[in-house]
Amino acid sequence: MSKIANVIGFEVMDSRGNPTVMAEVVLESGVVGTACAPSGASTGSREALELRDGDKSRYLGKGVLKAVANINETIKPLLVGKDVAAQRELDDIMLKADGTENKANLGANAILAVSLAAAKAAAQDKGIPLYAHIADINGTPGKYTMPVPMMNIINGGEHADNNVDIQEFMIQPVSAPNFTEALRMGAEVFHSLKKVLAGRGLNTAVGDEGGFAPNLPSNEAALEAIAEAVAAAGYKLGEEITLALDCASSEFYKDGVYDMSGEGKKFSPEEFADYLAELASKYPILSIEDGMDESDWDGWKVLTEKIGSTCQLVGDDLFVTNTKILKEGIDKSIANSILIKFNQIGSLSETLDAIKMAQEAGYTAVISHRSGETEDTTIADLAVATAAGQIKTGSLSRSDRVAKYNRLLRIEAELGEKAPYRGRAEFK
């Protein structure tokens, strides 16, 4: 048994220049595990609470000294002396100490950073990679796959300062024989897209997740630009490269209406479902995330019945990585996939529970970053360890995004054929 000797919290910076929480878990053996909590921009109302200080004199109120203090003063004495390999016990201790449904007392950012740091320390102590340790915890040792990257190459919505309503326009290199080649294909399309946009006199600055963020006349114009870039890169759209959307519909849903102000259109839920169905019939869109508002379950039902048999419908704000909400969705046949974000629920154990529930119900699970990221690459190991099959970690620029891709390259080099890349087969 490897015991925890110390737990230390720090205030560090994320990719948007805002503070976030870093935790170190130190073992009696001297091994140290370090992890950072990410932060979202478009957030579901039922996400676990990200504890911020609210002191306007520091970081415009976004400091996390309270969360750091909760690690150093409350969590540390509870975990010192505990077995670092007992992940669920450690997480349960922190959840019990918090005592709230949404982790409002200690902060999901504090609990998560410690939870992930403990897993990293345990993996190092065992002398195995993090993905192997997570697979052990998950009860799926050795059952690995390499995820299909869903690369967000045009950013809109809350992730960019432009007029595009849909938040993410993504490509998936589904024909690649392995992850390494998939990454190359995506990078080539990314560079091709820059030339396409520049050729139209459009801005090629990037948004929070590393994708381009130009002003465009419509959401469909983004798809048209990507289609041109795919062809210019020498690939066949629909065969080698497919598309995905993250609508983040909760950001433009008001009073029962989907108000896409960027292109001056308003839709009822039924009309918006028709709009998305039309896009999915016109372009090879394999996946649509948050196609309806998180509270519009009737709209979700309409959308699921309309295109759920042919398109992956991912619940992000809808499910917030929460098993209680996911179970309700499964029981009501709402959506057919869940987005997995550590900090929506706030601990590794609860994250694994959500993935397992989804997979057992025949739902896909898409592992995801947040728009506010750090150099932490845990989601790469999580995707491989759980054989989730899909990962969202941004575009092919910004080191906070590329760090995850580089980690996946190293994992594939280690595992080889033990972690197959299944491409289109991952999209049910």
Swiss-Prot record:
Cellular component per GO, a single term = cell surface
The question of whether Amino-acid biosynthesis is a record keyword is answered with no
Q: Which residues form the active site?
A: 209, 341
Question: Which controlled-vocabulary keywords does the entry list?
Answer: Cytoplasm, Glycolysis, Lyase, Magnesium, Metal-binding, Secreted
Which cofactor does the UniProt annotation name?
Mg(2+)
This protein's pathway reads:
Carbohydrate degradation; glycolysis; pyruvate from D-glyceraldehyde 3-phosphate: step 4/5
Q: Where does (2R)-2-phosphoglycerate bind?
A: 167, 341, 370-371, 392
EC number(s) from the headed UniProt entry: 4.2.1.11
- Binding of Mg(2+): at which residues? 246, 289, 316
SMART domains in the record, alphabetically? Answer: Enolase_C (SM01192), Enolase_N (SM01193)
State its location(s).
Cytoplasm; Secreted; Cell surface
> What is this enzyme's catalytic activity, as reactions?
(2R)-2-phosphoglycerate = phosphoenolpyruvate + H2O
Family of the protein in this entry: Belongs to the enolase family.
Q: Please identify the protein, giving its name as recorded.
A: Enolase
> Which species is listed as the source?
Saccharophagus degradans (strain 2-40 / ATCC 43961 / DSM 17024)
Tell me the classification of the organism that encodes this protein.
Bacteria, Pseudomonadati, Pseudomonadota, Gammaproteobacteria, Cellvibrionales
Q: Which gene encodes it?
A: eno
